[in-house]
Amino acid sequence: MLIIETLPLLRQQIRRWRQEGKRVALVPTMGNLHEGHMTLVEDAKTRADVVVVSIFVNPLQFERPDDLARYPRTLQEDCEKLTRHGVDLVFAPAAADVYPAGLEAQTYVDVPALSTILEGASRPGHFRGVSTIVSKLFNLVQPDVACFGEKDYQQLALIRKMVADMGYDINIVGVPIVRAKDGLALSSRNGYLSAQERKIAPQLYKIMQALAEKLALGERQIDDLLADTAEQLRDAGFTPDELFIRDAQSLQPLTVDSKQAIILMAAWLGKARLIDNQQVDLHS
């Protein structure tokens, strides 16, 4: 497995693969890899001849410097896992190489229709940071296919719109959420949980399932459903952060024509901000 840290060497290797006619898959990550990431890798391997995994803790995605500083950086362990899973290349650049002019002078890619709603309303600039780094990685790696987890549902929708709007010839694949046996969605941030908090954490999924069942049975008093769900989260020990029920395709409020809903949840448990989502088929 190749480990490349500079842009010129990455371009050189990508050019070589292109000359050989190889199909390239990209799995963008911020490192601290877990089995959910490995599922993305395994999916990517079925879709391409070579798989590139990027590991870059993107400063543009963090509102608070302390959150950026404490984000786990485990490059050696990550590379060992990726070697075992047959990855061809790890791209692990420094921030100074990705943003040589500094963050203030950086050119941004924005998807305004999706970057300022829902989670984006409370995290200004976050999704602009996502679309900027993903666009840059697309330009550098020039993948035929890129795999993203469905756990970050709004992010996936934003990337799909960016690809469509910008004319990228890239197949965007959403890979289903990977869960622990007790239902907790796998996340790098689960490492922030204490032992006691880890026992509580699966309640997020169970509470979301109960909400999904009510929607599937035809309940449509959205404000009441959300208020009840928030109360259940608080009773379980969470601090609710974001809670939405939206049209799964447009991310806009449900209408009589909506065929599928998406429940988007984010809640704090101790120092960990846990997110999850679930799609629900709506029957008229």
Curated annotation (Swiss-Prot):
InterPro entries: Pantoate_ligase (IPR003721), Pantoate_ligase_C (IPR042176), Rossmann-like_a/b/a_fold (IPR014729)
Enzyme class: ligase
Record-level GO BP terms: pantothenate biosynthetic process
Protein localization: Cytoplasm
SUPFAM superfamilies attached to this UniProt entry: Nucleotidylyl transferase (SSF52374)
Pathway(s) where this gene product acts: Cofactor biosynthesis; (R)-pantothenate biosynthesis; (R)-pantothenate from (R)-pantoate and beta-alanine: step 1/1
Positions annotated as active site in the UniProt record: H37 (proton donor)
UniProt miscellaneous comment: The reaction proceeds by a bi uni uni bi ping pong mechanism.
Record's protein name: Pantothenate synthetase
Organism: Yersinia enterocolitica serotype O:8 / biotype 1B (strain NCTC 13174 / 8081)
Native organism taxonomy: Bacteria, Pseudomonadati, Pseudomonadota, Gammaproteobacteria, Enterobacterales
